[in-house]
Amino acid sequence: MEKIFLLHAAARSGKNTCADAMKDYYVNSYHKRVLIIAFADYVKFVLDKYYNTPAERTEEYRTRIQQFATEQVRASDVNYWANVVSDLLVAIQEDWDIVIIPDWRFGNERVALISRFHEYGIPVKTMLIDRPNIEEVDGMTEEQRAHSSERNLDNYQNFDYTIINETSQMQKTIQQLVDLIDEEENN
């Protein structure tokens, strides 16, 4: 594994679209093996498998995810989801060159991953996806928008990179950013 990217953005700002575009560009232009893995993958798996709550895009499901992942599990172990993902990544690190985590929501997740992967010499880079003029997110209540999982990084200032998601230019912006990152690492 060469590097890990943590992507952060407001809901519906293009985190998954950005992750997919980064993956496509790394695969097609740099011939890298790229894994997209989300902290929420495990949350959704546990809810589906053990709580009989299958994933769906509803107000009730989003509330359930927020309550379960944050108030229940993180309250017990603030690094639980970061540790689950990092444990798997350590075990499979030889299989992937680039890892993209498109749902970074809490500062401690970054700290936990940096701490874990420092010993392997694998950098963890942060990326903000900023979507100007984003409209109110359909399907989210005021409480969901105010939830700590949506607001925790609002005042975070130390992103390694920022992508302005003006949808029509996003692919080009990502390509330029990936090229810049590659150039920085090779100089």
Per-range role (PLM):
Residues 85-143:
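ATP-dependent NMP and nucleoside kinases share a basic, alpha-helical "lid"
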Residues 18:
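Hydrophobic positions on the alpha1 helix immediately C-terminal to the Walker A/P-loop
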Residues 79, 84, 125-187:
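Small-molecule kinase domains that catalyze NTP-dependent phosphoryl transfer to phosphate-bearing small molecules
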